[in-house]
Amino acid sequence: GNKGCGTKKSLEEFRNNWQLPLRAAFSDRIYNTDKFLVDGEWASCFGHIDAIHSGEFMGIAPTNKRVKIHYTDFWEVKDGLIIDNWVTVDFPSILSQLDVDVFNGQGWEAYDRGEIAPAKPN
């Protein structure tokens, strides 16, 4: 997955290093699949989890704020078995909801607000 997700090579690693930490950091989780797509041996979905930030997350103490965790999930399936899985999670959005600006005010939203002007292309 994207930076911050890490790489899991087994179901045990997924459970111990993804699922359990997520559950420890976010309670009252409601999972929402917005769209599910299939194309041959590939399947994908995107959606979000509504949850309460009730445990430590990436070094941030619990805030008890309700957050929306956007994700995409891709699976490669052969002979009825998942042989690969790629997940992306919108960590900058989660952190922003917890009042952490990972872009230090320099995200492209600053262009939208007119705070900075884009550089001219070379």
Map each language-model feature to its residues.
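C-terminal and inter-domain tail/linker signature
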Residues: 1-122
